[in-house]
Amino acid sequence: QVEDIRELIGDLTLAKLQNIFNSIIKRQENKVDPIRSKFGKIEKEEVSLEDKMSDLELYAGTHHYFSFRGLLERQPGKIQVIVTFLAILELMKTGVITIEQEHLFDDIQITSLIYEEQQADGETGSSD
């Protein structure tokens, strides 16, 4: 477990995370699907935080570095963006990933800590 939240997020502030999150949400709202926009009723989409965390852990196991913005932009809808955002926060809290931002307004880079562990396990050739 991560002892110090400041060590976890470095100079990244909640305001920076919120700005990126808000810009992604705004883009999701501005997307118009020509087929779905004509529907009278949209079905409720069930999205599980646990499932999203599992999906992200699998992704982190095969990708050492990936983009926060890119990850959110690939989500098909607003609910998916929100749940993905929450899953990222949970994975940071549990020490599966870390995040960093080089400069103000730069994209946030996510680093997978389990990718590094899996690579180290693969190099030792353990066959438990």
Model-derived features: positions:
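Long, charge-dense, low-complexity tracts
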Residues: Q1-D128
